[in-house]
């Protein structure tokens, strides 16, 4: 079963005079099955951010089709789209996007509170998730009282607690040191393995990408190639670097820490 399906997805930005100024994404096809962990990589300006914005439903395609969990977002009205985004999607951002005025517990529970889930169920979900991610000891802390890595793990918990169809992770390790980054990627991999979370990760970091099961490479707004991971993450990491070298662009954009 495909959780995500795009067909001929394109995004063109126009000038004020109506002439084409930039073709950000061109005829892009992508299928993501339930329980997959897929990475998106490419040089700056390749179309990664545009693709993510379209999938997040904060921008609309110029043409093409996109279906998430059997629903076409473009057919939804504004209020329906906001509800769809809240229930079907989970987000993990580079800068965490946790609210400083709330505790870690309250931040994680926010999606359930907005949906008016019963308190007993909220606490049960949180208890299980906090156990899995080993963050029980920070639940009653404020965001500024915990490390960046702990904040991002809390953000991962918030992204999945409402059981979304798809989690979109945008450079989730971008603001972290290598140790914290590895912990966060282990967290996402754990959610994928144990909770069968379907995750789409956009990253420049080859090490972060090596935690995925499949990498799709974009160049100039178009599909370039894809590679699949076997049993050895180190071999997959090297395959990612090899593909990036063929892909071109500024190779120094890509963080090449060894896994």
Curated annotation (Swiss-Prot):
GO terms for biological process: transmembrane transport. ATP binds at residues 42-49. GO terms for molecular function: ATP binding; ATP hydrolysis activity; transmembrane transporter activity. Its EC number is 7.-.-.-. It comes from the Bacteria. GO terms for cellular component: plasma membrane. Keywords: ATP-binding, Nucleotide-binding, Translocase, Transport. It is an enzyme of class 7 (translocase). InterPro entries: AAA+_ATPase (IPR003593), ABC_transporter-like_ATP-bd (IPR003439), MacB-like_ATP-bd (IPR017911), P-loop_NTPase (IPR027417). Belongs to the ABC transporter superfamily. Residues 4-248 form the ABC transporter domain. The keyword ATP-binding applies. This is Uncharacterized ABC transporter ATP-binding protein YvcR. Pfam families: ABC_tran (PF00005). The keyword Membrane does not apply.
């Amino acid at each position: 079963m495909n959780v995500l399906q795009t067909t001929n997805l394109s995004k063109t930005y126009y000038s004020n005079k109506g002439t084409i100024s930039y073709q950000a994404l061109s005829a892009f096809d992508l299928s993501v099955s339930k329980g997959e962990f897929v990475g998106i990589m490419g040089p700056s300006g390749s179309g990664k951010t545009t693709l993510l914005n379209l999938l997040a439903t904060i921008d609309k395609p110029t043409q093409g089709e996109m279906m998430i969990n059997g629903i076409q977002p473009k057919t939804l009205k504004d209020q329906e789209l906001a509800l769809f985004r809240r229930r079907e999607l989970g987000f993990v951002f580079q800068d965490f996007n946790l609210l400083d005025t709330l505790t870690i517990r309250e931040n994680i529970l926010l999606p359930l509170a907005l949906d008016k889930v019963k308190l007993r169920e909220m606490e049960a979900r949180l208890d299980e998730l906090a156990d899995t991610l080993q963050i029980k000891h920070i639940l009653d802390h404020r965001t500024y009282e915990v490390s960046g890595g702990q904040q991002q793990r809390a953000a991962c918990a918030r992204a999945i607690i409402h059981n979304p169809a798809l989690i979109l992770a945008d450079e989730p390790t971008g603001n972290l040191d290598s140790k914290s980054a590895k912990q966060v990627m282990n967290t996402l991999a754990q959610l994928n393995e144990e909770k069968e979370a379907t995750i789409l990760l956009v990253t420049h970091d080859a090490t972060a990408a090596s935690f995925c099961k499949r990498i799709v490479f974009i160049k100039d707004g178009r599909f370039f190639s894809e590679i699949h991971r076997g049993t050895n993450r180190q071999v997959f990491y090297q395959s990612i670097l090899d593909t990036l070298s063929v892909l071109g662009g500024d190779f120094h954009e890509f963080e090449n820490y060894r896994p």
